[in-house]
Structures are given as C-alpha cells and as structure tokens.
C-alpha cells in the first residue's frame, strides 16, 4: 500500500507456545512471518519464568535463540505496576511492596532487562486500588508513583507504556488519560487495549470513546477483542471467569475497524515522535487470549495466534494500514547466499 501509514506487527510470543519454551515461541513467530515479539513468560530449560526472573545465562540463551530465529524484542512485557497501592486486605491475592523498595529493585531490574534485550519499551500498569473503592480517589497517589517510574525509565533512555486494564486505578481510558495528563513526562505513554475495556461491560461506542480519550497519549496498541453476553457489571471488578471470551480482532464487540481507521490518521505523527526516542516505529502488539486469559497473561496456541494474526491483517487491509510479514526477500537475506 504505497503512502499508507505503516505499523510494526508484534505479539506476546508466550501465547503461541503450548509449553512456553523459547524454541516453541520463536519458531511459531518466525513461521507466522513476525519479526518482533514482546517477552513475558519463557522457558529456557529451567522451567517457565517471568522475564523479570531470568538469570544472566538464561538471558544470553534467549538472545542466541533470537538471533537464530531473527527476532527482535518490541517491548518488555513486565508486570511493573501490578501491585497494591497500600498494604490493605481487600480479599484479593494482589501483593504489596513498599514503593521505594519497588522502585529501586523491580523498576531498575526492568530497565536492565530492557537494555539486555535491546528494546526501548517497557509495558506496565497503574497499581491496584483496594477492591470496591473508587479509582478516582487514588489518581494523585498513582500519578506520584508513575512519575517516579517514568523518570527512572527516562534516565535509562527508555519509555514506559501504561496499559489500560480492569481492576487497576487506570481501568478506563478516561482515568488513564487523566493520569497521563498529570504525570506529563516524555518517558510515559499509554497503551490502549480494546478488550480490556469492553470486558468491563462497556459498549462498543463507549470503548471507542475511551480510545479517543487516550489517543493523544498513545505509544502503541495491544490487539485483542472480546465477545460475550456475560460481561461484568459496568466498571466493576472483573474476575477470571469473565476472561474466557476473547476473540480475534475481526470478530468482537470492540469495533477494531473503527479504532484502527481512526488510528491510521495518528500513525505518521506518532511514528516521528517515537523515532525521536529511538523506537523503530508504531507497534501493534497482539495479545489475543483466544484460548483463555488471566490476570498475568493468556494463551492462544500456535493455531490461535495464527487465526488472530490473520484476523488483524484483514482489518488492517480494510482500513488501509500497511505492515510487513516475512517474505522471500527476507528468506534470501537470511540464507546468506
């Protein structure tokens, strides 16, 4: 598509692997034609670990396999920000870590890992407020913490992406947009995820409005969709049972066609902004969960990831957004003769 806005396709590779081994993940993504992936859970021979728990030898092995399969990391799929704001028993299993300790240990570790995997992007979240409380009451506290996280990332020449997700303070587009406005830091951008909104009981129109609220602060987008007659009470707590009804981007209630058609107008300026921070382009990061989702991840299998990719590509083709999947020119370049 000449002169069409272009995105870089990526995805959470752990969703494509039945056993989350590095070879499974990378073989699936290479076969799908993807050249980027977000790293989250991975097994390098010592069991499944979150990226935050990888040892230096494991990191080195992942890097070797990335080179073998010609993959790059789009973002570090960290769980930064998925802890409680306060040490309050609210009936959930969410853990609490004193913030100064969290900043000096976990956030700095995430920055070190981002550099180890040569990515400029760290995915993160907006902290858990006590269950059944009003998230707006905690915006000021979250802004203070996220401002400090953004500054740590900035000093490491990295960018922190804040994802909209249920049960967190930034659970809606309006909340996340206000947090972004108050933090007002060049190293913090927003990540829209339509399914994370619509599974909270919001309508298609309301989901689009939440995307529009976040649009000026966007850094990249996660792609998954949701279709079920049983969503949660609007804006209420989302439990694990609800997280079983995800579908490809061309089949759900989130209207990715409308979202991506609008986003196409934003891509050129956003790409220029991201490149100034050393980021190669605008990522669409697939996290389809088509075989089930959960609080810290989801699963699609190699077949489900393929179905999700083809569904996304159909939408992109329809709205006029360009992308690249590996072709024979890439194969010729890789074979070295």
Give the role of each language-model region.
Residues 18-23, 50-64, 102:
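Aromatic- and glycine-enriched glycan-recognition loops and surfaces
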Residues 23, 28, 68, 84-190, ...:
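Active-site acidic/histidine proton-transfer and metal-coordination neighborhood
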Residues 43-56, 80-104, 126-139, 236-247, ...:
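Surface-exposed, active-site-proximal loop segments in enzymatic domains
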Residues 12-14, 28, 32-56, 77:
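N-terminal substrate-binding region of glycoside hydrolase catalytic domains
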Residues 56-78, 143-156, 182-183, 255-263:
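Alpha-helix-loop-beta-strand connector modules within alpha/beta enzyme cores
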Residues 38-39, 73-78, 119-126, 158-163, ...:
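Short beta-strand segments at enzyme active-site cores
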Residues 2-10, 19-35, 67, 173-337:
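Histidine-acidic metal/acid-base catalytic patches
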Residues 12-16, 40-44, 78-81, 127-129, ...:
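Active-site beta-loop-alpha junctions enriched in small/polar residues
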